[in-house]
């Protein structure tokens, strides 16, 4: 499954179908990866279903937007590499899921089936098999001559994972079939759901607590995780159950039943557990009655479900109806609304995530909902809190969304605590809410750094990335990475121990560590984890690992400036942007003082990125952390004078256009430069000097200049502009052969590594990009080039092999023919 990056701004609007479809694909693929591969879904099923249906409708309306990686062509998630792959003889297709669970939804499905079968009002009702939609992990069990020979997960619907050894530990699943009428099929694939009963889940968590181990979140994820344990002994410790509900490949079954219901009866006779909560019903009204009956008893069931499934009962009619795309026409799943309950908000706090995201959280009077006791519920972000107007003291509806993530759905306003307005009529007092609306804190509750929220983003973030303890582990992991400071040997386990055992409070502390610190840390970590290394048992202390680690830390003290900037973890600053900063501004001293308008003058730096960089360096705690690194001996290499090409970007007209003055376009900025030829003159410009500008632009500019902060920003920009002009050489350096060109690398080159090729291209002035577009000048393709090569050919982008790239690099500047 492809990995996608989180969008830098909100989703594209629906009036931009191509961009909207691309965004939907990226979101759905990310959610599917979390759900099927990581077993850590971040959104409820209802959100995935909503986005999926939107993409499906969009691709129906615009067939040209469907791409090979579209989730509408898939059934589930990717196969984990630890298990052998199993190709399903008959694909394990998913059933269409409807969120319209009213009577109209069931009737609409019945009407669709009748229409497909060509039935009219005079024909009898269609018979359906109605059953439960279990909340577990789908499994295919293969029996040959009556014996279990293989068990596989759904995987992506075509290829699953071989989990036979783990499935054999589930006592409900027969290892051999019981003959029916003295017969078992030659080949029988039975499909069903592995799940965990609620009481078994509670007992398992009780055992975990007794052992002092981490408890599990919910039965579904616990069951899925158990099936995918590499050690079958660990899987055997989890109390798993199974229900059969369908068939895969079948061969040599004498007297195979003619209906789905009778097929389940025979599976039960073969020895498979089949849920008793099922029925054969007539027509849409029968489906509605079944749906309502199960809804009424849902909470009393011994296991979790998230809906019901309707299937045309006749197997012959199923074959006649067939499939549409990835789903059968003869079946549909109807979900129930997520379970909800009323409770009271005791307080609203904010949590700081490992990447600095600030999330409001409602602390609740404990309430039992969705099978668990909920004490906290996410409020998502500042906009959501304001939209719902959630306040302390409110009675709220809490939903265990997707049966996983508790959230506040809405406020019961008529129960909001009120106070009398002071001084109002004694006999007819006016009232006002007792508690004020929620306000996001201006500073991080963990470290005190400023909280910033980028324009167009819903999430606010702590700006103290180098300082904030909530972000400390993530900041160090990034800082030490191979493409950043490349600290050899400093892996995740050591970072966790250094932070958790209080050896490292800031990144600079890495460079103060001693051999004794590492050895003591290892000893304390082993004691905490109950581990006794063999060397300790033998009366020895291993030191080589610590010596190597210290050498790796010391060796990282002189990184190239661009890599050092990348290592700081500035939001939106990747390798390419870090290189741009280093190449154009030349020194850390210049970069850490550059305001957003100056940064906007650099190539490929947009408003969002410029603001993120400026915000990072504007945070005093980040500056302190940076100074601490320099004092610890870190010395970025390759600093130089500012790039002379920046001179034209520093013209007043160019800078005026980057100030962010409303209505001051690039054209108006040039007019303004005539009236105010220098930044100092702009700071004190008089209205009569702006007669050449439209009245609305003049008014907007004067309002902007009335701000003390804006005038201070202008003075800072003017001073730094003067320093840059004084420091830069009189003429630009000689251009490289690929100066200003965009190149994409794809596939495996015969002699050069990807990093080596990238370095050579960048040395020649090229920008190395990760994706092919109309702006790409060259694609350098090696073996197994894949989709990027296909995209280049589609866009008529020139394609080079390694030899062609090397030949191009030898040409004189300006000659790329």
Swiss-Prot record:
Residues the record lists as binding Zn(2+): 444, 447, 462, 468
Record's catalysed reaction(s): NAD(+) + (deoxyribonucleotide)n-3'-hydroxyl + 5'-phospho-(deoxyribonucleotide)m = (deoxyribonucleotide)n+m + AMP + beta-nicotinamide D-nucleotide
Molecular function terms from GO: DNA binding; DNA ligase (NAD+) activity; metal ion binding
EC number of this enzyme: 6.5.1.2
Enzyme superclass (EC): ligase
Domain of life: Bacteria
Keyword presence, Magnesium: yes
Residue ranges of domain BRCT in the record: 733-817
Binding-site list for NAD(+): 45-49, 94-95, 131, 154, 193, 311, 335
GO annotations of cellular component type: cytosol
Cofactor: Mg(2+); Mn(2+)
Residues at the catalytic site: 133
Pfam family name, one: DNA_ligase_OB
Keywords tagged on the record: DNA damage, DNA repair, DNA replication, Ligase, Magnesium, Manganese, Metal-binding, NAD, Zinc
Entry similarity comment: Belongs to the NAD-dependent DNA ligase family. LigA subfamily.
Function statement: DNA ligase that catalyzes the formation of phosphodiester linkages between 5'-phosphoryl and 3'-hydroxyl groups in double-stranded DNA using NAD as a coenzyme and as the energy source for the reaction. It is essential for DNA replication and repair of damaged DNA.
NCBIfam families the record matches: dnlj (TIGR00575), PRK07956.1 (NF005932)
Protein name: DNA ligase
Originating organism: Ralstonia pickettii (strain 12J)
Organism placement in taxonomy: Bacteria, Pseudomonadati, Pseudomonadota, Betaproteobacteria, Burkholderiales
């Amino acid at each position: 499954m492809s990995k996608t990056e989180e969008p830098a701004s909100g989703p594209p609007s629906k009036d931009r179908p191509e961009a909207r479809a691309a965004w939907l694909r990226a979101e759905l693929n990310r959610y599917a990866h979390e759900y099927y591969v990581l077993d850590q879904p971040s959104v409820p099923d209802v959100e995935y279903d909503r986005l999926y249906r939107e993409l499906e409708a969009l691709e129906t309306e615009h067939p040209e937007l469907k791409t090979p990686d579209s989730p509408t062509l898939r059934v589930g998630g990717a196969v984990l590499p630890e298990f052998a792959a199993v190709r399903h003889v008959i694909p394990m297709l998913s059933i269409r899921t409807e969120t319209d669970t009213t009577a109209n939804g069931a009737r609409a499905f019945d009407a669709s089936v009748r229409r497909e079968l060509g039935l009219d009002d005079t024909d009898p009702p269609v018979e359906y098999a109605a059953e439960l939609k279990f909340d577990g992990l789908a499994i295919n069990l293969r029996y040959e001559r009556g014996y279990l020979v293989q068990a596989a997960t759904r995987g992506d619907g075509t290829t699953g994972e071989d989990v036979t050894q783990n499935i054999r530990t589930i006592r409900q699943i027969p290892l051999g079939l019981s003959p029916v009428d003295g017969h078992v099929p030659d080949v029988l694939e039975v499909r069903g759901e592995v799940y965990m009963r609620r009481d078994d889940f509670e007992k398992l968590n009780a055992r975990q607590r007794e052992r002092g181990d981490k408890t599990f979140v919910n039965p579904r994820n616990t069951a899925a995780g158990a099936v995918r344990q590499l050690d079958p002994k660990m899987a055997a410790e989890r109390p798993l159950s199974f229900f059969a509900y369908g068939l895969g490949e079948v061969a040599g079954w004498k007297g195979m039943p003619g209906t789905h219901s009778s097929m389940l009866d025979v599976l039960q006779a073969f020895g498979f557990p089949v849920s008793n909560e099922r029925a054969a019903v007539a027509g849409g009204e029968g489906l509605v009655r079944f749906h309502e009956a199960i809804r009424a008893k849902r909470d009393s069931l011994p296991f979790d479900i998230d809906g019901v499934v309707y299937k045309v009962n006749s197997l012959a009619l199923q074959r006649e109806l067939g499939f549409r795309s990835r789903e059968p026409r003869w079946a549909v799943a109807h979900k129930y609304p997520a379970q909800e309950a009323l409770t009271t908000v005791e307080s609203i706090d904010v949590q700081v995530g490992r990447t600095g995201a600030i999330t409001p959280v409602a602390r609740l009077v404990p309430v039992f909902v969705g099978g668990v006791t909920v004490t906290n519920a996410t409020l998502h972000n500042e906009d959501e809190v304001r939209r719902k107007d959630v306040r302390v003291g409110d009675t709220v509806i809490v939903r265990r969304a997707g049966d996983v993530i508790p959230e506040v759905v809405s406020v019961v306003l008529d129960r909001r605590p009120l106070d009398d307005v002071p001084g109002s009529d004694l006999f007819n007092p006016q009232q006002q809410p007792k508690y004020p609306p929620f306000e996001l804190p201006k500073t991080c509750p963990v470290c005190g750094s400023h909280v910033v929220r980028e324009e167009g983003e819903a999430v606010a973030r702590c700006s103290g990335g180098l300082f904030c303890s909530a972000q400390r582990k993530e900041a160090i992991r990034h800082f030490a990475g191979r493409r950043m400071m490349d600290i050899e040997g400093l892996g995740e386990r050591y970072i966790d121990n250094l932070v958790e055992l209080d050896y490292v409070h800031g990144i600079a502390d890495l460079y103060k560590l001693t051999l004794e610190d590492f050895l003591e840390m290892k000893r304390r970590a082993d004691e905490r984890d109950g581990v006794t290394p063999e060397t300790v048992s033998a009366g020895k202390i291993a030191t080589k690992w610590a010596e190597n680690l210290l050498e790796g830390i010391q060796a990282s003290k002189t990184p190239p400036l661009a890599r050092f900037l990348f290592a700081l973890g500035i939001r939106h600053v990747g390798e390419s942007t870090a290189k741009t900063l280093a190449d154009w501004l030349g020194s850390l001293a210049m970069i850490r003082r550059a305001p957003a308008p100056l940064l906007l003058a650099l190539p490929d730096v947009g408003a969002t990125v410029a603001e993120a960089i400026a915000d990072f360096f504007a945070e005093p705690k980040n500056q302190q952390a940076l100074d601490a690194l320099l004092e610890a001996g870190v010395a970025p290499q390759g600093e130089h004078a500012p790039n002379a090409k920046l001179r034209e970007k520093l013209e007043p007209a160019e800078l005026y256009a980057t100030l962010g003055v409303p209505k001051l376009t690039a054209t108006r900025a040039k007019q303004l430069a005539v009236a105010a030829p220098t930044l100092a003159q702009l700071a004190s410009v008089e209205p009569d000097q702006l007669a050449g500008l439209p009245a609305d632009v003049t008014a907007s500019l004067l309002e902007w200049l009335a701000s003390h902060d804006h005038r201070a920003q202008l003075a800072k920009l003017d001073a730094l502009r003067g320093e840059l002009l004084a420091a830069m050489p009189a003429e630009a350096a000689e251009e490289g052969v690929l100066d200003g060109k965009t190149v994409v690398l794809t596939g495996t080159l015969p002699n050069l590594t990807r990093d080596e090729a990238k370095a050579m291209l960048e040395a020649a002035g090229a920008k190395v990009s990760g994706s092919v577009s109309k702006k790409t000048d060259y694609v350098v393709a090696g073996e197994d080039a894949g989709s990027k090569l296909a995209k280049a050919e589609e866009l008529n982008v020139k394609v080079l092999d390694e030899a062609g790239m090397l030949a191009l690099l030898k040409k004189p500047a300006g000659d790329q023919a």
